[in-house]
Amino acid sequence: MNSSEIRKRYLEFFAARGHRVIPSASLIPGNDPTLLWTSAGMVPFKPYFTGVATPEFRRVVTCQKCLRTPDIEMVGRTARHHTFFEMLGNFSFGDYFKERAIPWAWEFVTRDLGLAPEHLWISVYLDDNEAFDHWRGLGVPAERIVRLGRDTNFWEIGVGPCGPCSEVYYDRGPAYGCESASCGPGCDCDRWLEIWNLVFIQYFRNEAGDYSPLESPGIDTGMGLERVASVLQGVNTNFDTDLFRGLIDYTAGVLGVRYGDDPAGDAALKVIADHGRAITFAIADGVLPSNEGRGYVIRRLLRRAVRKALLLGREKPFLEGVALAVIEQMAGAYPELETARDSVRKVVRFEEERFRQTLTQGNEIIGRLIAEARAEKRSTLEGAAAFQLYDTYGFPLELTREICAEQGLAVDEAGFEAALKAQQQKARSSRRETRYVEERETFFRNLRDEIGLTRFVGYEQLEADAGVRALIRDGQRVPAAGSGEQVSLVVDTTPCYAESGGQVGDHGLIEGENVRGRITDTFAPVEGLHVHEVVVEAGVLEEGARIRILVDGSRRRKICRNHTATHLLHRTLKAVLGTHVNQAGSLVAPERLRFDFTHIQPLSEAELAEVESRINEIVLSNLRVESFQTSFDRARELGAVALFGEKYGDLVRVVQIDGVSMELCGGTHVLSTAEIGPVKITAESSVGAGLRRLEAVTGMEALAFLNSRNEQLHRIAQAVRVPVSELVVHVERLLDHQKKLQRENEQLQDRLQVYEVKELLDRASTHEGVRILATSVRARDMAELRSMLDLLRERLGSAVIVLGSAVNGKVSLVASVSRDLVARGLHAGAIIKEAAAVAGGGGGGRPEMAQAGGKNPEKLTEALEKARQVVLRRVDGGSA
């Protein structure tokens, strides 16, 4: 039975028994920033089991895509370790319990899957007699029902719902056993294969560790598709099922190897297939490779897959093809893969090419470090060196560890951690600031508990009467503030929007019987409490007074234009670049907007033009902009976009742009897109690995930007004395002329270099038959220095050459040793390492060629003399 048929039969079996078939949730847990991945079938339903939310359906069935990485090093080594896997599960939220879950499980595995009852064993929790009796009632012999302890057969996650488990095991026969007297279900050997786990959620554990029965117990089951497929397809490992074998065979063909010929090669192919599935599904769900969080996990998996291919001799990019093979195989069950096809291809291709560049640079360095360690008879790579590879070249520690292990070396991980901690010390000031923020938050939380929440009425009106509830200055409450004083104001009702979700806070005015003031900012230090920064301009502002608050309407309208434009930008970027685009941050201010989003490379001019054009088309369409409140689950069902990492309550606000965009958003917006006016993108930049930033202006600010650019064009045209219409052609001619002059200059420099080389040849000396040249030269950069070295090597033949130059306050050194002298024990890397140390630097390289740098130009002459002395010492019989 193939995996598609197993998946189909499971869903249909429980659908026929009143279960609602729910599509798989994203690998990114919705509305739960505490979880990195959806790692189990129950994760999407966690709020229902914990009582945080009320389920729409009391019986559901799913095939949930899951991702786990704690045992990443075991993938490919064992029969069943995976990063990405599928979990079949049926769930009851206060509906049926053991009396149905157990008979249905038995019916499905014996009838629908056709597994022989004599091969099935059952485990129950030690004192779960109820489950034991249900299994016995189905005809399972008592000797094939084993009672296991809390470690394996009791599910709990700290405080909250919990309960005993019952597992279905498939007995593969004595040939797969460990021959231990205690061998049975629960044993770690390969005989007993757990294929289904039924969790009976019937207790609540409190903070004291006490358990009480739940009024409405529930069911949470999980059947690993890969495991049950291995049983039904009669194969020894999950990797030999149809879920993996096609990918493995495809990869083997691309790499030019055969699966089954070599255990090490087979393990590498398994890793590539497993990791290829994980990265394809994760990228399709919106995760981009980066240096932190989920992005780091995906980057690590992708790089491990590439490394395994390199070990099999693959030098060219290949992983894009593996990802497409995953899509071809799995899109029938997960249509989001087809939707994200182009995004997955682009991301995988870009990341692999980028990593191969990193590998080229890093492998050269780590190869040198390993050679040095061996030369010095060390069995460990220094932690500081491993950290430099990580910090400077983006070389992950685990990759350094793997490469070193292949060469029989360990990595000083304690030293690595020490170097990492030393770098983290630089962040102490930010941690002090964090403590200050925490103390400030505690103050305002206590204030909120005392005076109550602020009622926000700013969606409907820009003016409101309010009562002054508190005045704060320098972290302390004060009874009043006089003219010229600045104070933080808390009221019971306000039309002022507090800074949130990237939108800046409102400005405005306050008016009272004896007071007038100006609001310069509005923020919410804790949820539900609006704080207004006020400068009192006349009279006295007192606690308990009644005032009127007036929002700066002109400023608010500009903010609304930019906020709605931000939603349009988000939607348009997804349409133009791909579904992998997700918001990563924003700033919505009156004069401009800024939008950070997930994308792996700079936008081309054509892409920027298309994004801008599409947004302005929507603006001109005069589409209606509406907002409404609904439950979080209902909003997601409607297709509303939620920001990853954000925590939402049960009731959320949805902003909908007719037929174009729907997002969860608490900000203020225009009523129709035509109010936005022209939208102009002003800048595009990088803000980190896998993150891009767009900046834009709207309305009159967009017009002012265009006018400014037009004025600049006219000024440039006047300066070069051509009409604006001819400016591009004229600049192109100037650039061509500049390139011609640059080429002529380089030719002159080359001629000068040849003359200088002739002069340098006379500086060479001979000692014991070895020609030595250690001298300073004029060179603009390291490339020119190496060029001079190459010319001298050709002219001198058998020789040791060390050249140095001082440019921009730094020392550059290069060295070469001819092959015949390498055979005599001279080593360019060793020579230059000692010389660079004199100039306050370091470096190294191969025996024949090396380079280094230094911080002290005044030590250049001394460093070159040191190099000459090292050569003389070696020639005279010392060490080089």
Curated annotation (Swiss-Prot):
Cofactor note: Binds 1 zinc ion per subunit.
Protein name: Alanine--tRNA ligase
Principal location: cytoplasm
Native organism taxonomy: Bacteria, Bacillati, Bacillota, Clostridia, Thermoanaerobacterales
Domain statement: Consists of three domains; the N-terminal catalytic domain, the editing domain and the C-terminal C-Ala domain. The editing domain removes incorrectly charged amino acids, while the C-Ala domain, along with tRNA(Ala), serves as a bridge to cooperatively bring together the editing and aminoacylation centers thus stimulating deacylation of misacylated tRNAs.
SUPFAM superfamilies: Class II aaRS and biotin synthetases, Putative anticodon-binding domain of alanyl-tRNA synthetase (AlaRS), ThrRS/AlaRS common domain, Translation proteins
Any Pfam family matching the protein: tRNA_SAD
GO terms (BP aspect): alanyl-tRNA aminoacylation
Enzyme class: ligase
Gene3D superfamilies: 2.40.30.130, 3.10.310.40, 3.30.54.20, 6.10.250.550, Bira Bifunctional Protein, Domain 2, Threonyl-trna Synthetase, Chain A, domain 2
GO molecular function: alanine-tRNA ligase activity; aminoacyl-tRNA deacylase activity; ATP binding; catalytic activity, acting on a protein; transferase activity; tRNA binding; zinc ion binding
Cofactor: Zn(2+)
Function of the protein: Catalyzes the attachment of alanine to tRNA(Ala) in a two-step reaction: alanine is first activated by ATP to form Ala-AMP and then transferred to the acceptor end of tRNA(Ala). Also edits incorrectly charged Ser-tRNA(Ala) and Gly-tRNA(Ala) via its editing domain.
GO cellular component: cytosol
Keywords: Aminoacyl-tRNA synthetase, ATP-binding, Cytoplasm, Ligase, Metal-binding, Nucleotide-binding, Protein biosynthesis, RNA-binding, tRNA-binding, Zinc
UniProt keyword annotation of Metal-binding present: yes
Domain of life the protein comes from: Bacteria
Keyword Aminoacyl-tRNA synthetase set for record: yes
Annotated binding of Zn(2+), by residue: 563, 567, 665, 669
Originating organism: Desulforudis audaxviator (strain MP104C)
Family: Belongs to the class-II aminoacyl-tRNA synthetase family.
Enzyme Commission number(s) of this protein: 6.1.1.7
PROSITE patterns according to UniProt: AA_TRNA_LIGASE_II_ALA
Cell compartments where the protein resides: Cytoplasm
Reaction(s) catalysed (UniProt annotation): tRNA(Ala) + L-alanine + ATP = L-alanyl-tRNA(Ala) + AMP + diphosphate
